[in-house]
Amino acid sequence: MLRMLKRQQLHPGMILLLFWLCYLIEDQKVQAGNCWLQQGKNGRCQVLYMPGMSREECCRSGRLGTSWTEEDVPNSTLFRWMIFNGGAPNCIPCKETCDNVDCGPGKRCKMNRRSKPRCVCAPDCSNVTWKGPVCGSDGKTYRDECALLKSKCKGHPDLEVQYQGKCKKTCRDVLCPGSSTCVVDQTNNAYCVTCNRICPEVMSPDQYLCGNDGIVYASACHLRRATCLLGRSIGVAYEGKCIKAKSCDDIHCSAGKKCLWDAKMSRGRCAVCAESCPESRSEEAVCASDNTTYPSECAMKQAACSLGVLLEVKHSGSCNCK
Protein backbone atom coordinates (compact mmCIF):
# COMPACT_ATOMS: atom_id res chain seq x y z
CA MET A 1 0.00 0.00 0.00
CA LEU A 2 2.93 2.37 0.81
CA ARG A 3 4.43 1.67 -2.65
CA MET A 4 1.08 2.61 -4.21
CA LEU A 5 0.86 5.82 -2.16
CA LYS A 6 4.44 6.85 -3.12
CA ARG A 7 3.63 6.20 -6.79
CA GLN A 8 0.63 8.61 -6.48
CA GLN A 9 2.93 11.25 -4.84
CA LEU A 10 0.30 12.20 -2.25
CA HIS A 11 0.83 14.95 0.31
CA PRO A 12 2.18 13.56 3.66
CA GLY A 13 -0.88 14.99 5.43
CA MET A 14 -3.17 13.08 3.07
CA ILE A 15 -1.26 9.85 3.79
CA LEU A 16 -1.73 10.35 7.53
CA LEU A 17 -5.47 10.99 6.97
CA LEU A 18 -5.83 7.77 4.98
CA PHE A 19 -4.08 5.76 7.69
CA TRP A 20 -6.37 7.34 10.32
CA LEU A 21 -9.52 6.47 8.32
CA CYS A 22 -8.35 2.88 7.90
CA TYR A 23 -7.79 2.65 11.64
CA LEU A 24 -11.29 3.98 12.40
CA ILE A 25 -12.95 1.58 9.97
CA GLU A 26 -11.06 -1.37 11.44
CA ASP A 27 -11.71 -0.28 15.04
CA GLN A 28 -15.47 0.25 14.56
CA LYS A 29 -16.12 -2.98 12.69
CA VAL A 30 -19.34 -4.49 14.09
CA GLN A 31 -18.66 -7.65 16.02
CA ALA A 32 -21.26 -10.34 15.38
CA GLY A 33 -22.25 -12.73 18.12
CA ASN A 34 -25.39 -14.49 19.32
CA CYS A 35 -28.42 -12.98 21.01
CA TRP A 36 -30.24 -14.97 23.74
CA LEU A 37 -33.55 -14.41 25.51
CA GLN A 38 -32.44 -15.33 29.02
CA GLN A 39 -29.55 -16.13 31.30
CA GLY A 40 -30.10 -19.29 33.33
CA LYS A 41 -29.35 -19.79 37.02
CA ASN A 42 -26.20 -21.62 35.90
CA GLY A 43 -24.94 -18.35 34.38
CA ARG A 44 -25.20 -19.63 30.79
CA CYS A 45 -27.18 -18.02 27.99
CA GLN A 46 -30.34 -19.93 27.12
CA VAL A 47 -33.08 -19.78 24.44
CA LEU A 48 -31.34 -18.55 21.29
CA TYR A 49 -33.09 -15.52 19.79
CA MET A 50 -30.87 -14.62 16.83
CA PRO A 51 -27.38 -15.69 15.67
CA GLY A 52 -25.00 -13.28 13.96
CA MET A 53 -26.13 -10.21 15.91
CA SER A 54 -24.04 -7.48 17.49
CA ARG A 55 -24.39 -6.69 21.18
CA GLU A 56 -25.78 -3.25 20.38
CA GLU A 57 -28.58 -4.74 18.26
CA CYS A 58 -29.25 -7.53 20.76
CA CYS A 59 -29.58 -5.21 23.76
CA ARG A 60 -31.54 -2.47 22.00
CA SER A 61 -34.95 -3.74 23.18
CA GLY A 62 -34.21 -3.07 26.87
CA ARG A 63 -35.88 -6.36 27.73
CA LEU A 64 -34.71 -7.83 31.02
CA GLY A 65 -33.13 -11.24 30.58
CA THR A 66 -31.76 -10.66 27.10
CA SER A 67 -28.10 -11.71 26.95
CA TRP A 68 -25.31 -11.90 24.40
CA THR A 69 -22.29 -14.07 23.60
CA GLU A 70 -19.49 -12.82 21.37
CA GLU A 71 -18.24 -16.20 20.12
CA ASP A 72 -18.98 -16.66 16.43
CA VAL A 73 -19.45 -20.43 16.36
CA PRO A 74 -21.04 -22.91 13.91
CA ASN A 75 -24.62 -24.13 14.35
CA SER A 76 -23.40 -27.51 15.56
CA THR A 77 -21.69 -25.84 18.54
CA LEU A 78 -24.80 -23.81 19.33
CA PHE A 79 -26.84 -27.00 19.25
CA ARG A 80 -24.40 -28.76 21.60
CA TRP A 81 -24.45 -25.83 24.01
CA MET A 82 -28.24 -25.73 24.15
CA ILE A 83 -28.91 -29.48 24.37
CA PHE A 84 -25.98 -30.88 26.35
CA ASN A 85 -24.30 -27.98 28.17
CA GLY A 86 -27.29 -26.14 29.65
CA GLY A 87 -26.65 -23.07 27.51
CA ALA A 88 -23.83 -21.00 26.05
CA PRO A 89 -20.75 -20.07 28.15
CA ASN A 90 -19.36 -16.55 28.63
CA CYS A 91 -22.86 -15.12 28.84
CA ILE A 92 -23.04 -11.31 29.00
CA PRO A 93 -26.39 -9.95 30.27
CA CYS A 94 -27.63 -6.80 28.54
CA LYS A 95 -28.83 -5.37 31.83
CA GLU A 96 -26.66 -5.29 34.96
CA THR A 97 -28.89 -2.84 36.87
CA CYS A 98 -32.54 -1.76 36.89
CA ASP A 99 -31.76 1.40 34.92
CA ASN A 100 -34.13 1.81 31.95
CA VAL A 101 -35.63 -1.66 32.44
CA ASP A 102 -39.23 -1.90 31.23
CA CYS A 103 -40.94 -4.79 33.03
CA GLY A 104 -44.38 -4.07 31.59
CA PRO A 105 -47.66 -3.26 33.37
CA GLY A 106 -48.09 -4.55 36.91
CA LYS A 107 -44.37 -5.28 37.38
CA ARG A 108 -41.26 -3.44 38.51
CA CYS A 109 -37.54 -4.10 38.40
CA LYS A 110 -35.81 -5.11 41.63
CA MET A 111 -32.27 -6.24 42.40
CA ASN A 112 -32.27 -9.76 43.87
CA ARG A 113 -29.96 -11.26 46.51
CA ARG A 114 -27.36 -12.05 43.86
CA SER A 115 -27.37 -8.39 42.74
CA LYS A 116 -29.14 -9.27 39.50
CA PRO A 117 -32.03 -7.19 38.14
CA ARG A 118 -35.34 -9.07 38.15
CA CYS A 119 -38.92 -8.15 37.25
CA VAL A 120 -41.28 -8.79 40.14
CA CYS A 121 -45.05 -8.47 40.43
CA ALA A 122 -46.07 -5.10 41.83
CA PRO A 123 -49.61 -4.31 40.66
CA ASP A 124 -50.96 -0.80 41.01
CA CYS A 125 -53.52 -1.09 43.80
CA SER A 126 -54.07 2.66 44.23
CA ASN A 127 -57.48 2.50 42.53
CA VAL A 128 -58.73 -0.45 44.60
CA THR A 129 -61.60 0.83 46.75
CA TRP A 130 -62.85 -2.44 48.29
CA LYS A 131 -60.45 -3.48 51.05
CA GLY A 132 -62.05 -6.79 52.00
CA PRO A 133 -61.77 -10.32 50.52
CA VAL A 134 -62.82 -11.03 46.93
CA CYS A 135 -63.86 -14.15 45.04
CA GLY A 136 -61.78 -14.84 41.94
CA SER A 137 -62.90 -16.34 38.64
CA ASP A 138 -60.93 -19.47 39.62
CA GLY A 139 -63.32 -20.06 42.53
CA LYS A 140 -60.72 -19.11 45.16
CA THR A 141 -61.05 -16.48 47.88
CA TYR A 142 -58.29 -13.84 47.98
CA ARG A 143 -57.39 -11.66 50.96
CA ASP A 144 -58.10 -8.57 48.85
CA GLU A 145 -58.12 -7.44 45.23
CA CYS A 146 -54.42 -6.58 45.38
CA ALA A 147 -53.57 -10.20 46.31
CA LEU A 148 -55.65 -11.36 43.34
CA LEU A 149 -53.81 -8.98 41.01
CA LYS A 150 -50.48 -10.39 42.21
CA SER A 151 -51.68 -13.93 41.48
CA LYS A 152 -52.84 -12.77 38.05
CA CYS A 153 -49.37 -11.36 37.39
CA LYS A 154 -47.70 -14.63 38.44
CA GLY A 155 -49.09 -16.72 35.58
CA HIS A 156 -52.88 -16.45 35.67
CA PRO A 157 -53.60 -13.76 33.04
CA ASP A 158 -57.32 -14.62 32.80
CA LEU A 159 -57.94 -14.25 36.54
CA GLU A 160 -60.57 -11.64 37.39
CA VAL A 161 -62.66 -10.58 40.39
CA GLN A 162 -66.02 -12.36 40.31
CA TYR A 163 -67.59 -10.54 43.21
CA GLN A 164 -66.75 -8.89 46.51
CA GLY A 165 -66.59 -11.07 49.60
CA LYS A 166 -65.55 -14.69 50.10
CA CYS A 167 -66.48 -17.31 47.50
CA LYS A 168 -69.88 -18.77 48.33
CA LYS A 169 -71.78 -22.00 47.74
CA THR A 170 -75.09 -20.23 47.05
CA CYS A 171 -76.13 -17.04 45.29
CA ARG A 172 -77.50 -15.63 48.52
CA ASP A 173 -75.79 -12.32 49.36
CA VAL A 174 -73.76 -12.42 46.11
CA LEU A 175 -73.82 -9.05 44.36
CA CYS A 176 -72.60 -9.46 40.79
CA PRO A 177 -71.10 -6.44 39.02
CA GLY A 178 -72.82 -4.80 36.05
CA SER A 179 -75.39 -6.88 34.21
CA SER A 180 -73.91 -10.26 35.16
CA THR A 181 -76.02 -12.87 36.96
CA CYS A 182 -75.12 -15.23 39.80
CA VAL A 183 -75.20 -18.94 38.92
CA VAL A 184 -74.36 -21.97 41.06
CA ASP A 185 -72.28 -24.45 39.04
CA GLN A 186 -72.06 -28.25 39.22
CA THR A 187 -69.50 -28.07 42.03
CA ASN A 188 -71.88 -25.92 44.12
CA ASN A 189 -69.82 -22.76 43.73
CA ALA A 190 -71.41 -19.38 42.98
CA TYR A 191 -70.16 -17.56 39.88
CA CYS A 192 -71.10 -14.32 38.13
CA VAL A 193 -71.77 -14.81 34.43
CA THR A 194 -73.16 -12.72 31.59
CA CYS A 195 -76.35 -14.17 30.14
CA ASN A 196 -76.70 -14.34 26.36
CA ARG A 197 -80.28 -13.40 25.59
CA ILE A 198 -79.96 -14.29 21.90
CA CYS A 199 -78.32 -17.45 20.51
CA PRO A 200 -77.32 -17.92 16.85
CA GLU A 201 -79.45 -20.12 14.64
CA VAL A 202 -78.58 -23.81 14.86
CA MET A 203 -76.95 -24.93 11.63
CA SER A 204 -76.35 -28.61 12.39
CA PRO A 205 -78.06 -31.38 14.40
CA ASP A 206 -74.59 -32.15 15.80
CA GLN A 207 -75.03 -29.11 18.06
CA TYR A 208 -77.84 -30.72 20.07
CA LEU A 209 -77.07 -31.41 23.73
CA CYS A 210 -78.92 -33.43 26.33
CA GLY A 211 -78.95 -31.54 29.63
CA ASN A 212 -78.68 -33.13 33.05
CA ASP A 213 -82.30 -32.10 33.54
CA GLY A 214 -83.39 -34.41 30.70
CA ILE A 215 -84.19 -31.51 28.36
CA VAL A 216 -82.82 -31.23 24.81
CA TYR A 217 -80.98 -27.98 24.06
CA ALA A 218 -80.37 -26.78 20.52
CA SER A 219 -76.77 -25.76 21.27
CA ALA A 220 -74.30 -25.00 24.05
CA CYS A 221 -75.42 -21.36 23.86
CA HIS A 222 -79.04 -22.33 24.51
CA LEU A 223 -77.99 -24.44 27.51
CA ARG A 224 -75.91 -21.58 28.95
CA ARG A 225 -78.84 -19.20 28.51
CA ALA A 226 -81.17 -21.59 30.35
CA THR A 227 -78.56 -21.96 33.11
CA CYS A 228 -78.39 -18.18 33.49
CA LEU A 229 -82.14 -17.78 33.71
CA LEU A 230 -82.42 -20.67 36.17
CA GLY A 231 -79.59 -19.43 38.40
CA ARG A 232 -77.93 -22.81 38.83
CA SER A 233 -75.93 -25.15 36.65
CA ILE A 234 -77.74 -27.59 34.41
CA GLY A 235 -74.74 -29.30 32.86
CA VAL A 236 -74.39 -31.55 29.84
CA ALA A 237 -75.40 -35.19 30.23
CA TYR A 238 -74.19 -36.15 26.77
CA GLU A 239 -74.00 -34.91 23.18
CA GLY A 240 -77.05 -35.28 20.95
CA LYS A 241 -80.75 -35.44 21.77
CA CYS A 242 -81.90 -37.05 25.01
CA ILE A 243 -82.98 -40.68 24.68
CA LYS A 244 -85.06 -42.97 26.89
CA ALA A 245 -82.19 -45.13 28.08
CA LYS A 246 -82.68 -48.21 30.24
CA SER A 247 -79.04 -48.23 31.32
CA CYS A 248 -75.65 -46.79 30.44
CA ASP A 249 -75.38 -49.41 27.70
CA ASP A 250 -77.75 -47.27 25.62
CA ILE A 251 -75.70 -44.08 25.99
CA HIS A 252 -72.65 -43.29 23.86
CA CYS A 253 -70.10 -41.01 25.54
CA SER A 254 -67.42 -39.06 23.69
CA ALA A 255 -63.76 -40.03 24.05
CA GLY A 256 -62.34 -39.73 27.57
CA LYS A 257 -65.74 -39.90 29.29
CA LYS A 258 -67.68 -42.65 31.03
CA CYS A 259 -71.42 -43.03 31.57
CA LEU A 260 -72.62 -42.83 35.18
CA TRP A 261 -76.15 -43.99 35.97
CA ASP A 262 -78.45 -41.75 38.00
CA ALA A 263 -80.74 -44.29 39.69
CA LYS A 264 -82.88 -41.56 41.25
CA MET A 265 -83.81 -40.00 37.89
CA SER A 266 -83.40 -43.19 35.81
CA ARG A 267 -81.05 -41.57 33.32
CA GLY A 268 -77.33 -41.49 32.61
CA ARG A 269 -74.77 -38.78 32.10
CA CYS A 270 -71.23 -38.76 30.73
CA ALA A 271 -68.43 -37.71 33.06
CA VAL A 272 -64.65 -37.33 32.95
CA CYS A 273 -62.95 -39.82 35.27
CA ALA A 274 -59.73 -38.73 36.97
CA GLU A 275 -56.97 -41.35 37.11
CA SER A 276 -55.61 -40.05 40.40
CA CYS A 277 -56.41 -37.44 43.03
CA PRO A 278 -53.99 -35.09 44.81
CA GLU A 279 -53.42 -35.66 48.50
CA SER A 280 -56.41 -34.19 50.31
CA ARG A 281 -56.67 -32.21 53.55
CA SER A 282 -59.20 -32.91 56.28
CA GLU A 283 -61.22 -29.79 55.45
CA GLU A 284 -61.78 -31.07 51.89
CA ALA A 285 -63.93 -34.03 53.01
CA VAL A 286 -67.42 -34.23 51.47
CA CYS A 287 -70.62 -36.10 52.24
CA ALA A 288 -71.94 -37.71 49.05
CA SER A 289 -75.46 -38.60 47.91
CA ASP A 290 -74.84 -42.24 48.96
CA ASN A 291 -74.34 -40.97 52.55
CA THR A 292 -70.66 -41.89 52.46
CA THR A 293 -67.88 -39.52 53.52
CA TYR A 294 -65.08 -39.14 50.97
CA PRO A 295 -61.68 -37.44 51.56
CA SER A 296 -62.40 -34.99 48.74
CA GLU A 297 -64.75 -34.31 45.85
CA CYS A 298 -62.16 -35.85 43.53
CA ALA A 299 -62.16 -39.07 45.59
CA MET A 300 -65.97 -39.12 45.41
CA LYS A 301 -65.87 -38.82 41.62
CA GLN A 302 -63.28 -41.61 41.46
CA ALA A 303 -65.61 -43.86 43.45
CA ALA A 304 -68.51 -42.93 41.16
CA CYS A 305 -66.46 -43.89 38.10
CA SER A 306 -65.46 -47.21 39.67
CA LEU A 307 -69.09 -48.02 40.56
CA GLY A 308 -70.55 -46.60 37.35
CA VAL A 309 -73.15 -44.66 39.36
CA LEU A 310 -73.70 -40.93 39.77
CA LEU A 311 -72.61 -39.46 43.10
CA GLU A 312 -73.13 -35.82 44.05
CA VAL A 313 -72.04 -33.70 47.01
CA LYS A 314 -74.74 -33.32 49.66
CA HIS A 315 -72.61 -31.02 51.78
CA SER A 316 -69.02 -30.29 52.80
CA GLY A 317 -67.50 -32.22 55.70
CA SER A 318 -68.32 -35.60 57.19
CA CYS A 319 -71.78 -37.14 56.82
CA ASN A 320 -71.84 -37.37 60.63
CA CYS A 321 -71.61 -33.60 61.01
CA LYS A 322 -75.09 -32.78 59.74
UniProtKB/Swiss-Prot annotation:
PROSITE patterns to which the protein is assigned, alphabetical: KAZAL_2, TB
Glycan attachment sites: 75, 127, 291
Key words, A-Z: Developmental protein, Disulfide bond, Glycoprotein, Repeat, Signal
Superkingdom field: Eukaryota
Domain Kazal-like: 103-169, 189-244, 267-321
Any one Gene Ontology cellular component term annotated for this protein: extracellular space
Domain Follistatin-like: 97-120, 170-193, 247-271
InterPro entries registered for this protein in UniProt: Fol_N, Follistatin/Osteonectin_EGF, Kazal_dom, Kazal_dom_sf, TB_dom, TB_dom_sf
Signal peptide range: 1-32
Cysteine disulfide links: 35-58, 45-91, 59-94, 98-109, 103-119, 121-153, 125-146, 135-167, 195-228, 199-221, 210-242, 273-305, 277-298, 287-319
Single GO molecular function: activin binding
A Pfam family of this chain: Kazal_2
The TB domain, residue ranges: 33-106
Gene3D superfamilies named in the record: 3.30.60.30, TGF-beta binding (TB) domain (3.90.290.10)
CDD domains reported for this sequence: KAZAL_FS
Biological process terms in GO annotation: cell differentiation; determination of dorsal identity; dorsal/ventral pattern formation; embryonic viscerocranium morphogenesis; midbrain development; negative regulation of activin receptor signaling pathway; oocyte differentiation; otic placode formation
Tissues expressing this chain: Not expressed in the organizer region. Expression in gastrulating embryos is confined to anterior and paraxial regions, which give rise to head mesoderm and the first five somites. In addition, expressed transiently in a subset of cells in the posterior notochord anlage. Later, expression is seen in brain, eyes and somites.
Record function comment: Binds directly to activin and functions as an activin antagonist. Specific inhibitor of the biosynthesis and secretion of pituitary follicle stimulating hormone (fsh). Inhibits bmp-signaling during later stages of development including late phases of dorsoventral patterning, to refine the early pattern set up by the interaction of chordino and bmp2/4. Not involved in organizer function or early phases of dorsoventral pattern formation.
Assembly behavior: Monomer.
Protein name, entry field: Follistatin-A
UniProt source species: Danio rerio (Zebrafish)
Lineage: Eukaryota, Metazoa, Chordata, Craniata, Vertebrata
